[in-house]
Amino acid sequence: MTIIRKKHPLIKIINHSFIDLPAPSNISSWWNFGSLLGLCLAIQILTGLFLAMHYTSDTATAFSSVTHICRDVNYGWLIRYMHANGASMFFICLFLHVGRGVYYGSYNMIETWNMGVILLFAVMATAFMGYVLPWGQMSFWGATVITNLLSAIPYIGTTLVEWIWGGFSVDKATLTRFFAFHFILPFIITALVLVHLLFLHETGSNNPTGLNSDADKIPFHPYYTIKDLLGVLVLLMAFMILTLFFPDILGDPDNYTPANPLNTPPHIKPEWYFLFAYAILRSIPNKLGGVLALILSILILALMPLLHTSKQRALTFRPITQTMYWILVADLLVLTWIGGQPVEYPFIIIGQTASITYFAIIMILMPIAGMIENNILDLD
């Protein structure tokens, strides 16, 4: 009798994706983040669904409904904080996943990589709209500042902003549509994730050496299901410690004050995972220039296959580019710190220097380092 998982039209797809999938025998824990992101997405959709049952997307009651969830709904406080901190865990996994892709040259799988960049934009858009929903001070002013950036687009900017707002300011219409988009986008993201996996399984996974691993494959189950399970346990432990012991550590105290259009907070800043991009935006005095730099700071990932000059795929055996890579990581941490600081000396100049360094490393220094390493190889 043939095994059902190999013959059933639906189970067969799952089998080829998660059970009998040929995987390289040497992939490290850096390859765990794909499954962890899937877990984060599932947690966010599930907790979000329960929050949506009690939330009201009206400016008069939104803040109160979130308070009601935390105080009156059974385990509402847990669901709310799981959802808020789940977003942070999602972005930690995302950044590590992208960082792994850059380090090991996974961007050479162009379709998979570009789908990943689209996913990153979609997740960032979803998180931004979600942050607006509690209708606290930072929700309101964050929405006002970020949507206002679109007014920098020549000719159609102002019309576009008013169209997104549904009026002449961020108000009831804006909140309602943001809730609608925030609800539907995770399901679109789930569909895009399936396309991301489809493209990945066309080529097979990369590995730490960057070499072809067709001659040395092992089945995904049980080897990598067990390995992923360890990652899941570590993530869930960190997640529950964060949620149960330090639920507000990554949030902004200003968001516990109801939105007030007449009172601007002293420092308007987004959630921690957007601070690096926010720092790049603020480092350019020109509005349109800042918006373009902001978009390019993420879109530059899509250019990485074009900027690859090395004969080797991964950075495993490339010490010069490795140095550039870790300087880039440090630079992103500096940008994250600067994004949360006020716009004054010396933070302005540090932010501008870090922004220039960010683009210079990716667009100039890493490609040059790749060419130098090629020449060193040719000398042998």
Swiss-Prot record:
Record keyword DNA-binding present: no
Protein's GO biological process: mitochondrial electron transport, ubiquinol to cytochrome c
Listed InterPro entries: Cyt_b/b6_C, Cyt_b/b6_C_sf, Cyt_b/b6_N, Cytb/b6-like_sf, Cytochrome_b, Cytochrome_b_C_euk/bac, Cytochrome_b_N_euk/bac, Di-haem_cyt_TM
Binding site for heme b b562: 83, 182
UniProt keyword list: Electron transport, Heme, Iron, Membrane, Metal-binding, Mitochondrion, Mitochondrion inner membrane, Respiratory chain, Transmembrane, Transmembrane helix, Transport, Ubiquinone
Binding annotation for a ubiquinone: 201
Binding positions (heme b b566): 97, 196
Family matches, as SUPFAM superfamilies: a domain/subunit of cytochrome bc1 complex (Ubiquinol-cytochrome c reductase), Transmembrane di-heme cytochromes
Names of required cofactors: heme b
CC annotations in GO: mitochondrial inner membrane; respiratory chain complex III
Textual note on the cofactor: Binds 2 heme b groups non-covalently.
Transmembrane spans: 33-53, 77-98, 113-133, 178-198, 226-246, 288-308, 320-340, 347-367
Quaternary structure note: The cytochrome bc1 complex contains 11 subunits: 3 respiratory subunits (MT-CYB, CYC1 and UQCRFS1), 2 core proteins (UQCRC1 and UQCRC2) and 6 low-molecular weight proteins (UQCRH/QCR6, UQCRB/QCR7, UQCRQ/QCR8, UQCR10/QCR9, UQCR11/QCR10 and a cleavage product of UQCRFS1). This cytochrome bc1 complex then forms a dimer.
Protein name: Cytochrome b
Organism for this UniProt entry: Microtus lusitanicus (Lusitanian pine vole)
Name of the encoding gene: MT-CYB
